Structures are given as structure tokens and as C-alpha cells.
Swiss-Prot record:
Positions in the Cytoplasmic compartment: 37-299
Subunit organization: Homodimer. Component of the ER-mitochondria encounter structure (ERMES) or MDM complex, composed of MMM1, MDM10, MDM12 and MDM34. A MMM1 homodimer associates with one molecule of MDM12 on each side in a pairwise head-to-tail manner, and the SMP-LTD domains of MMM1 and MDM12 generate a continuous hydrophobic tunnel for phospholipid trafficking.
Name assigned to this protein: Maintenance of mitochondrial morphology protein 1
TM region positions: 16-36
One Pfam family in the UniProt entry: MMM1
Name of the encoding gene: MMM1
Organism the protein comes from: Coprinopsis cinerea (strain Okayama-7 / 130 / ATCC MYA-4618 / FGSC 9003) (Inky cap fungus)
Length: 299
């Protein structure tokens, strides 16, 4: 076999091997020079960043949708929705550094960019560049409030309040980064990625669980349903010179990761002022989790 491969006479085996090597080399050149980027400044190679049209009419539509009542109840939640709107406006203003116009937009962009690079997996993603941010104009709308009676198996448990929530706004984020290929050497090549992510709709039921009177560290617990609805709209570009637009698998991956993060943080506990410290509340929560885990193991 060795004599056949290294023979000076052209053979079928030599032609087959050379043909396969040629295909591999050609494929490597196509990937490296069309899709991958080996420059040190990846943000300079992509001049177009997909964005959504952010017209004032759309913001007005989002604001109008928040003010409409979903159902006719005896007790309206309009007062609480108005309160949520004001709270959301305060958070937006603080994120913008209490600045208006383009200056406030730039402040919010810089803060979000710093946070994104702080939590990014440095071994896989290059620096993240935030190009634009839309913080929205509305707030979640709550409706259909109802009371859930105490658990008959646990007479000490307090009644729970449950209501439905829907959030439709103009939240969007436009960014670019690069996926790093660390073989055969570190940062051997980069795959530039440009993304624009926009929220279409979030819908879920929310439970509010008050603390028991004898609780060591009284907290108010908010829990979203694990069956929440999350609709995101994404536009994407992948590649350096030759670009792939709106890859479906990338959209599915982003939506899955956002759902996973929300599902993992589906419970929020608010310490009641003057009754306990945050540290005491954390210790109480940890103790409850350990007891719950122990009961599950025994079962």
C-alpha cells in the first residue's frame, strides 16, 4: 500500500487522496476568508447593524395598550397599573442618568454595555459592543386578580393572591460581538455576529404570597408561572465578508436562553421594611430550601 501511495506513477489512490486534500483546503479557505474574521478589531469589519423601526406611533400604541383594561372586574387594577407605570418610568430615568434625549440614550447604552461585558463568557465571546438601546415606554398590565385560599394541609399558610400580567412594549437591544475559535491557538479566528433583539410579548400569571405572622424574616414573595409566554423578535447577521442573515437556530438559542434565565429567577422575595434585614431573609430562604430538599429526598 505504501508503494502505491508514494509511487511516481499516477494511481487512483493518489488521485483520491489529493482530491480530498484539495476539498479540505478549499473549504478551510472559504470559512477563513468569507465567514471568519482574524482581525484584531472585529467591530470595524461590519458596517451594518440590523435595527427595528422605532417610530413614535409604536410607542404611543404601546402606551395605549397598557391603559386598556383586559376584563371588567368589580375591583379594578387600573390604580396599580398606573403605579407600575410610574415605577417603570423612574427606573428608566435612573438608567439614563436622569438625562433626556441622545445624552440619556448614550448613558444607558454605556451602562448596559459595561454590564454585558462583565457577565459575558470571555473564553467564547469577544467584547460586546452595544450599538443602540430602546428602554420602552410602557409597563406590565395586571388584570384578573383573584384570591387563592390557604392550603388545607397547611392551616398556617396564608392565602395567596394571583393575577395575570401582560407586557407589550418597544424594548429592543442592538449589539455585535464575535464568537472565538480557540483552536489550534487562542483566538485563532472570530465569527462576527450582529444581533437586534426586541420584545414582542410577555404574558404570565403571578402569585403574591404574604409572610406568615410568626415568620423569623418576613418577606413578600412574587412568583411567575413556569408556563409563561415569551415572544422575542430577532434579526441577525453572521459572518465577515459573506453574511448569513436571520439564522433560525440562533433565534431559537436566544429565546431558549432568555426563557432559562427567567425560569431560574422566577421567584423574587421582598424584605418588609423594619422587620428584617436582607441578610436575615437570605438565611431564612436558604433554610427553607434545605428543608424542602430534605422533604423531597425523604419522599
Amino acid at each position: 500500500m505504501t508503494n502505491i501511495i508514494f509511487s511516481l506513477q499516477p494511481t487512483f489512490t493518489q488521485g483520491l487522496i489529493l482530491g480530498q486534500l484539495s476539498v479540505l483546503v478549499l473549504l478551510g479557505l472559504i470559512l477563513k476568508y468569507l465567514f471568519l474574521d482574524s482581525t484584531k478589531n472585529p467591530f470595524e469589519t461590519t458596517s451594518y447593524h440590523p435595527q427595528f423601526d422605532r417610530k413614535p406611533a409604536r410607542k404611543q400604541q404601546a402606551q395605549d395598550s397598557q391603559s386598556q383594561s383586559e376584563i371588567d372586574d368589580v375591583e379594578s387594577l387600573d390604580w396599580f397599573n398606573l403605579l407600575l407605570q410610574q415605577v417603570a418610568n423612574v427606573y428608566r430615568s435612573k438608567l439614563r442618568g436622569d438625562l433626556a434625549g441622545a445624552e440619556g440614550d448614550e448613558t444607558a447604552r454605556q451602562r448596559i454595555e459595561a454590564f454585558a461585558n462583565k457577565i459575558r463568557p470571555a473564553g467564547f465571546l469577544d467584547l460586546i459592543k452595544i450599538h443602540s438601546v430602546d428602554l420602552g415606554a410602557g409597563a406590565p398590565t395586571l388584570f384578573n386578580a383573584r384570591i387563592r385560599e390557604s392550603d388545607p394541609n397547611d392551616p398556617d399558610s396564608p392565602p395567596e393572591i394571583e393575577f395575570d400580567a401582560v407586557y407589550e412594549d418597544t424594548l429592543s437591544l442592538s449589539l455585535s460581538t464575535s464568537y472565538l475559535f480557540n483552536y489550534p491557538t487562542a483566538s485563532f479566528a472570530r465569527l462576527p455576529i450582529s444581533l437586534t433583539i426586541s420584545l414582542s410579548q410577555f404574558k404570565s400569571s403571578i402569585r403574591v404570597i404574604p409572610p406568615t405572622p410568626d415568620s423569623v424574616a418576613p418577606v413578600l414573595t412574587f412568583t411567575i408561572s413556569p408556563d409563561f409566554v415569551l415572544d422575542l423578535t430577532t434579526t441577525s447577521l453572521m459572518g465577515s465578508r459573506a453574511k448569513l442573515a436571520n439564522v433560525p437556530k440562533l433565534h431559537e438559542l436566544i429565546q431558549h436562553q432568555v426563557r432559562r434565565v427567567l425560569g431560574g429567577r422566577a421567584t423574587w422575595k421582598v424584605v418588609l421594611p423594619g422587620l428584617a434585614s436582607v441578610a436575615e431573609a437570605k438565611q431564612q430562604v436558604l433554610k427553607q430550601e434545605q428543608e424542602e430538599s430534605k422533604r423531597q429526598e425523604e419522599a
